[in-house]
Amino acid sequence: YFGICLGMQIAAIAFARGVLGYEDANSTEFAPDSKHPVIALMEEQMDLADMGGTMRLGAYPCRISPDTLMMKAYGKGLIEERHRHRYEFNNKFREVYMEHGAIFSGQSPDGTLVEAMEIPGHPFYLGVQYHPEFKSRPNRAHPIFREFVKAALEVKEKNS
């Protein structure tokens, strides 16, 4: 699985429902009254009435954890990726996710924002909050796309 932006958010919701047993887990974008809002508005936007121009937009740094798919793909501990979103992983759920095996392999340098989530034990299970497609080119694929295709080919070969 490789989820980009909303794809990472959906992976986080699926983990909450399937692994944590939070049947009503959701994003406040889709279910504002969810008892388990694992995806929510960025904290600095919670009290805003007018959302115009409030996205997290542009390039931001991301710190990568060692021994992760992210580190395997990038080969370095600090990267910069482009964003376009206003919803993010709700840190109130971070500890319970980690207790149940989720790995937050990419974070803002200060550790407050989840940038990437992995689930070990799969050939490839990675969700990223940013948009790697913005930095990928036909003659120079983004490192995560390369790793995803490589993992898919390895699974295909193993199952042939």
Q: Where in this protein do the model-derived segments appear?
A:
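Amide-donor transfer/coupling interface in amidating biosynthetic enzymes
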Residues: 18-160
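Catalytic nucleophile loop
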Residues: 1-16
